[in-house]
Amino acid sequence: AKLQELSEMAEKVQKDMANLAAIEKNVRTQMDKYGIALKEEAKPENSLRGIGGPSSVEISETTVLMEQNKNLHQQLQHKTEDWNKLLTKLKKENYRKEMTPNLWPCNSQYVTSEFGGRYNPFDGYSSDWHGGLDIADSYGAPVYATASGYVEYSGWYYGYGKYIRINHDYGYKTAYAHMAELYVSSGDYVTKGEVIGEIGSTGYSTGPHLHYEVLLWGQEINPRDLM
């Protein structure tokens, strides 16, 4: 009976080890995907204490081996819990990264108007508040979603012309204006880096460019602060 119990315990240990290996692989896959380097102190302990035992099983040694296997089973369960906690933490961190608008929204880096106060581009002398970045680019060039989220609005929006607004998590929203073509519709889910439209000059615009805005809890912020 004790030999049968020992065999069952050994089988549990094998299953624990297989489960642990799968979780650890998942953690490392998440780390590689997002380029995360795991600090040494954050890693679950790699060594498993109390592993070992006689090479041949005799009846008099069965109790000792069963105790060793029980200890190993408990250690593997604790380590699995640690890796699961780490995996949950990584997923939360990765989700936050996906929802943070820190990508550049188009191929061109040529900013013609920065965030903040400026002269009105239509009359050249009156003061004007500019709540985003104006980035000049070729007509028809791609526009990218700078973070993942749901398209809150896609269509014509007053002086912004063809316009997209995306609602991300953590209070972030992004807006893309004066576009020539819109590839996504209201209610669509877009992923970070996805092409959502083309550079244009619709609405109140002096030439092909992208007007790009970032809002945090409804307040316009400088997009450069996140890049």
Where are these regions (language model features)?
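Catalytic cores of peptidoglycan-degrading enzymes
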Residues: 103-227
